[in-house]
Amino acid sequence: MAIFGSKGYKVSLRGRSGVLYKEDDRRVLIDAEMLTGSTNLVIYFDRLKLWEEPRKLITREEREKIRENVTSELEKHGLVIEWD
């Protein structure tokens, strides 16, 4: 498991099928899939609905922040990602 993070959040790759995002006391596991070819990882953004802890809806603003932070960290480490 690779862990990346800065500025109050952490992004972890969870095997070949997920990205764990942690921010303060909240966390969410985002469905993803490792690929071969020009794209390394596809992340299923539409499935991002609820924080795991605490169980609360993720707002539109939080979704965009999560997307920006995950993209920034993974691309910084050389991964080519696609959001679906």
Which role fits each region the language model picked out?
Residues 1-18, 23-84:
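Cysteine-centric segments in proteins
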